[in-house]
Amino acid sequence: MSTTAATTLGRELLEAARAPEFAGWLRGLRRRIHQHPELAFQEHRTSALVRAELDALGVAYVWPVAQTGVVATVVGAAGPGPVFGLRADMDALPIQEMVEWEFKSLEDGKMHACGHDVHVAMLLGAAKLLQSRRDHFNGKVKLVFQPAEEGYAGGYYVLEEGAVDDVQGIFGMHVDAGLPAGVVASRPGPFLAGSARFTATINGKGGHAAAPHHAVDPIVAVSSAVLSLQQIVARETDPLQGAVVSVTTIKGGEAFNVIPESVTLGGTLRSMTTDGMSYLMKRIREVIEGQAAVNRCTAAVDFMEDKLPPYPATVNDEEMYAHAKAVAESMLGEANVKLSPQGMGAEDFGFYAQRIPAAFFGIGVGNDGGGMAETTTKNQLHSPHFVVDEEALPVGAAFHAAVAIEYLNKNASGPSA
């Protein structure tokens, strides 16, 4: 596809998505999903909505995938070709929404505070655009509506079930309240950190607070461990390589005059590389066990890898990033495509990027000119005050579709499904 044709395609898709009827449909989808947020692996209502919309569009799908997920396929009518993937996550967060608006969450203690309602609506919009333009591309587009991104590794289980084994390239997006609507951003190579959780129990010997010499105090041991863990990042890792160790929970005794028998602590570790993740896990175990021993205690450290697979870093394939960037520039203009800094947040899109050439972009949902979604320090992901500018919905739908169509046409002579 020529540069002129690619530019024309992207702008045609964006114009179609911004048409009043289409944009209104996108807003309606997003608001329906927003009012009924569902936590990880509980996305039954959202999954049913996705399937109903796909049925209405005449798009075939497989369900269930990874418990509640849906994987749909739009088949190009221009002939055989490769398979390209687009992915959106569906789950919400255990947060009480504090935003007062007509479509506020109706589910107590649950909120789409990370924009996954936007992601689902945009991908359904892409499905509609792709289905109406099947004669414009070869091959197939797989649309992955994935459960459980928020800490429960839904993407890992989608891959384990083989739902995207035939996909040769994949693309995803995440809302970014720090960018205005109509702007996208990413970077080649490592983009988001890998992440894992840890928990540890330090066991001592309980006793009366008046006679600590008759006890073995696990609180002293856990205090030493917390302080020593900070040295891993401060003194053992390259300051130019992102790494974070955060202790976020400590639970000990209940009485003021009793030294407890044991104390538990837990937290997260993050790194931009696989080697960095392995090193942090090794040293966290050594430090906690070592500080426990120094203080006459014992420790058991658990990274919960069987229940909560660690997230790998999200690393953008250089060629796939360049492809998506070129599509965005032709559709939105170069001024609206930014180079994003690396971030220490984690995304289970990293599982896809480990196996498939992938590109992951941020899409602006902030609004600098007033309106509902003002870009402020209050409007952050995972905040009960999080809001979005719905003008981003058509942009995301068109961007998804354009990235897929242009990839398939550019690689039409490649492997066929």
From Swiss-Prot:
The biological process GO terms on file are: auxin metabolic process
Cited Pfam families: M20_dimer (PF07687), Peptidase_M20 (PF01546)
User: What keywords were assigned to this record?
Assistant: Hydrolase, Signal
The enzyme's main class, written as a single word, is hydrolase
Enzyme Commission number: 3.5.1.-
Cite the InterPro entries for this sequence.
Answer: Amidohydrolase, Bact_exopeptidase_dim_dom, ILR1-like_Hyd, Peptidase_M20, Peptidase_M20_dimer
Q: Does the keyword Signal apply?
A: yes
What CDD domains has UniProt attached to this entry? M20_IAA_Hyd (cd08017)
Source species, domain of life: Eukaryota
Does the keyword Signal belong to this entry? yes
GO MF annotation terms? IAA-Ala conjugate hydrolase activity
Q: What task does this protein carry out?
A: Hydrolyzes certain amino acid conjugates of the plant growth regulator indole-3-acetic acid (IAA).
Task: Give the family this protein belongs to, as stated in its UniProt record.
Answer: Belongs to the peptidase M20 family.
Kindly provide the name given to this protein in its UniProt entry. Answer: IAA-amino acid hydrolase ILR1-like 3
Species the sequence originates in: Oryza sativa subsp. japonica
Its organism's taxonomic lineage begins at:
Eukaryota, Viridiplantae, Streptophyta, Embryophyta, Tracheophyta
